[in-house]
């Protein structure tokens, strides 16, 4: 491998950090809409460009790369309604290439490290939902979705309804059943089963699903397993996590064993040698992608030998020994019936295309974002046009432009509204030169209210189950709450005003009781979650933790000057100004006062039994730890006065390395930074730096 420079990285200038904060927030919002809301507003291609820009900034200025950066989290780090389940080993994502030249470059880089003429597995990339199965002594004990790669949603009962997933493995003389087996795969709809499901829904007078992937995700997450059972989902296994008593020499051998035990594996997987053979498979499936029983959106290429996989290792989000070749997006034409607008949480007004439904890449599409008024003009689309629609990455629809020759003269230009469609407030850019226009009625605009109430329940905020988007809308429409400030004062009588939380007999539903219980439990969440829940611009979990750790109470944060706030490590001028500006608004302070009066804890109670033995030390945690989640490790460092940093530099005191630590471990060794294993981390927490002078991995 090429060694990295030993020079300390240049810290990001304030203007760059401000741009990174805004860009990271945009990416988080798009991840949230995609992974949690199932309502993306930009194409895959546009999202990849945003994420790529963010990654480029972090490569140039490593101090920007924090553990909760969107570049470091698989699946965005969001949770939904099911119980959390930790994976035994991380479920990583895959890096993508979009051209054969890029694929050959990747193969060349791999073979420079390992030697030439490697065996590669070529597997069709299923457009479905990742699922993690755990078998103990051959019996299925847990199934969980990918989630953030470390923790997913437990869906064991639902998984047991899928015919492809065996409850009990069948051993053979050649392949005895291991004591522990963690296996990963993709849940999907076979196209004929998806068509049958939609036909049945239409016959019942219900709306059909838009595409197989979304319907697979929704079907797997049903609260009633009987509904999942009726949906005829399928699964194919494509990887391993942790195992005991099973050490395959290659990925191909692993698949052979999985099949022998009764687990489903793809019949389309082929083992080849060299770059030319890999490219041949890419071209073959590019021409035959519609010949498969399920949707595919690319080809996954993996180094076959397990020892070489270990040698190549992984980054924080993807293995270095595998790559996904994504096929070019597919296109179709349809009629643009109207252009409508949507108002988001920050007041941004986004136009979207309302079209005649058209099938593209196996999905029925009728909506697509147009981003802003300038973009509508740039694309040159008119209402009534025949437009070219592309499914970027086979997932998100994008309007490319009009078919000008198809115009009849009846088409007309779209004009961005002058007033908010939700509250009729005049719209304007937040600052001169902005392409986006916004609704400035932040306090009362119904659209912004819904989004803020929903945000309070997010995983990065109070993490309140039951309070989903539908619940937020119902509470506001029934006037059970006036704004997010009323949430923690909700009573049973308030919930009975809504149809959502009221039984047919007129009593409080089980979900209503759960909501009240969850709200009550949330009152004791740590201060940093309160800060995130307040929807202060630029304040995500990292900045919130830094502020909470420094000041300890919301009153102290509220009373601090911009200079005092900016002096906090990990905050800076932009965030400090946003915090001070937020607390300068009367109705913002009223929200805080309402929460405080309702019993929400506004300060962190310091446990005097925990020593401040890491005061001023910068500590980086990388890889997967057995007894600490990433949040727990951060919390353990912060409460002892340390800084949980996201990148390694000469100022780093220690690097804690779990399984698959990636480049941060290499950087620490290169810079001479002490590296601790998990036992060393425990000693550090208990006794401070002196306790680990001679520790390491």
Curated annotation (Swiss-Prot):
Listed under catalytic activity are: NAD(+) + (deoxyribonucleotide)n-3'-hydroxyl + 5'-phospho-(deoxyribonucleotide)m = (deoxyribonucleotide)n+m + AMP + beta-nicotinamide D-nucleotide
Q: What class of enzyme is it?
A: ligase
BRCT domain residues: 609-697
Indicate which residues the UniProt annotation says bind NAD(+): 44-48, 93-94, 123, 146, 186, 302, 326
Give the matching PROSITE patterns.
BRCT (PS50172), DNA_LIGASE_N1 (PS01055), DNA_LIGASE_N2 (PS01056)
What's the domain of life for this entry? Bacteria
Key word Chaperone present = no
Q: Which InterPro entries does the UniProt record give?
A: BRCT_dom (IPR001357), BRCT_dom_sf (IPR036420), DisA/LigA_HHH (IPR041663), DNA_ligase (IPR001679), DNA_ligase_AS (IPR018239), DNA_ligase_CS (IPR033136), DNAligase_adenylation (IPR013839), DNAligase_N (IPR013840)
Instruction: Output the Gene Ontology cellular-component terms.
Output: cytosol
Per the similarity annotation, which family is this?
Belongs to the NAD-dependent DNA ligase family. LigA subfamily.
- UniProt name for this protein: DNA ligase
Its source organism is Rhodococcus opacus (strain B4)
Q: Provide the organism lineage as a comma list.
A: Bacteria, Bacillati, Actinomycetota, Actinomycetes, Mycobacteriales
């Amino acid at each position: 491998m090429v060694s990295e420079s030993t020079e300390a990285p240049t810290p990001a200038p304030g203007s760059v950090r401000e741009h990174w904060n805004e860009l990271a927030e945009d990416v988080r919002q798009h991840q949230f809409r995609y992974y949690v809301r199932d309502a993306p507003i930009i194409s895959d291609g546009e999202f990849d460009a945003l994420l790529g820009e963010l990654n480029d900034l972090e490569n140039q200025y490593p101090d920007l790369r924090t553990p909760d950066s969107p570049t470091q989290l698989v699946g965005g780090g969001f949770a939904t309604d099911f119980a959390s389940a930790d994976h035994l080993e991380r479920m990583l994502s895959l890096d993508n290439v979009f051209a054969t030249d890029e694929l050959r470059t990747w193969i060349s880089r791999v073979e420079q490290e390992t030697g030439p003429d490697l065996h590669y597995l070529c597997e069709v990339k299923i457009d479905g939902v990742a699922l993690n199965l755990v078998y103990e002594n051959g019996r299925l004990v847990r199934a969980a979705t990918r989630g953030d790669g470390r923790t997913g949603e437990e869906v064991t009962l639902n998984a047991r309804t899928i015919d492809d997933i065996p409850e009990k493995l069948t051993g053979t003389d050649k392949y005895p059943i291991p004591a522990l087996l963690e296996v990963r795969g993709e849940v999907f709809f076979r196209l004929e089963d998806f068509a049958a499901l939609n036909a049945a829904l239409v016959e019942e007078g219900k709306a059909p699903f838009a595409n197989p992937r979304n319907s697979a995700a929704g079907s797997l997450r049903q609260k009633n397993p009987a509904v999942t059972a009726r949906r005829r989902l399928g699964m194919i296994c494509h990887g391993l996590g942790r195992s005991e008593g099973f050490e395959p020499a290659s990925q191909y051998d692993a698949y052979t064993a999985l099949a022998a035990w009764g687990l489903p594996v793809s019949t389309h997987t082929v083992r080849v040698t060299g770059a030319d053979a890999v490219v041949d498979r890419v071209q073959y499936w590019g021409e035959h992608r519609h010949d498969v029983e399920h949707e595919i959106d690319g080809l996954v290429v993996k180094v076959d030998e397990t020892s070489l996989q270990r040698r190549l290792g992984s980054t924080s989000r993807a293995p270095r020994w595998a790559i996904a070749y994504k096929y070019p997006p597919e296109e179709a034409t349809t009629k643009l019936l109207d252009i409508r607008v949507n108002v988001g949480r920050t007041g941004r007004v986004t136009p979207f295309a309302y079209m005649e439904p058209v099938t593209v890449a196996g999905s029925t599409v009728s909506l697509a974002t147009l981003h802003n008024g300038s973009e509508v003009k740039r694309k040159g689309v008119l209402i009534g046009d025949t437009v070219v629609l592309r499914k970027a990455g086979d997932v998100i629809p994008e309007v490319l432009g009009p078919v000008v020759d198809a115009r009849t003269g009846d088409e007309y230009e779209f004009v961005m509204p002058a007033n908010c469609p939700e509250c009729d407030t005049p719209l304007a850019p937040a600052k001169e030169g902005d392409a986006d226009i916004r609704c400035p009625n932040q306090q009362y605009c119904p659209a912004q209210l819904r989004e803020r109430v929903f945000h309070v329940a997010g995983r990065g905020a109070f993490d309140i189950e039951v309070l989903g988007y539908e619940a937020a809308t119902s509470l506001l429409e029934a006037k059970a709450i006036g704004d997010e400030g009323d949430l923690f004062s909700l009573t049973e009588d308030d919930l009975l005003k809504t149809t959502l939380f009221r039984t047919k007999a007129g009593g409080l539903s089980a979900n209503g009781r759960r909501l009240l219980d969850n709200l009550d439990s949330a009152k004791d969440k740590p201060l940093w979650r309160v800060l995130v829940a307040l929807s202060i611009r630029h304040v995500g979990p990292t900045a919130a933790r830094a502020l909470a750790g420094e000041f300890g109470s919301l009153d102290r944060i509220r009373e601090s000057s911009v200079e005092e706030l900016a002096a906090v490590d990990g905050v800076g001028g932009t965030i400090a100004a946003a915090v001070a500006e937020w607390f300068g608004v009367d109705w913002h302070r009223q929200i805080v006062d309402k929460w405080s009066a309702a019993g929400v804890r506004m300060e962190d109670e310091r446990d005097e039994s925990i020593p401040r033995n890491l005061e001023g030390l910068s500590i980086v945690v990388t890889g997967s730890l057995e007894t600490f989640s990433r949040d727990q490790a951060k919390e353990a460092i912060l409460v002892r006065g340390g800084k949980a940093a996201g990148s390694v530099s000469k100022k780093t005191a220690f690097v804690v390395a779990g399984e698959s630590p990636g480049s941060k471990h290499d950087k620490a060794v290169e810079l001479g930074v002490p590296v601790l294993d998990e036992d060393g981390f425990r000693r550090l927490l208990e006794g401070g730096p002196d306790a680990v002078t001679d520790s390491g991995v």
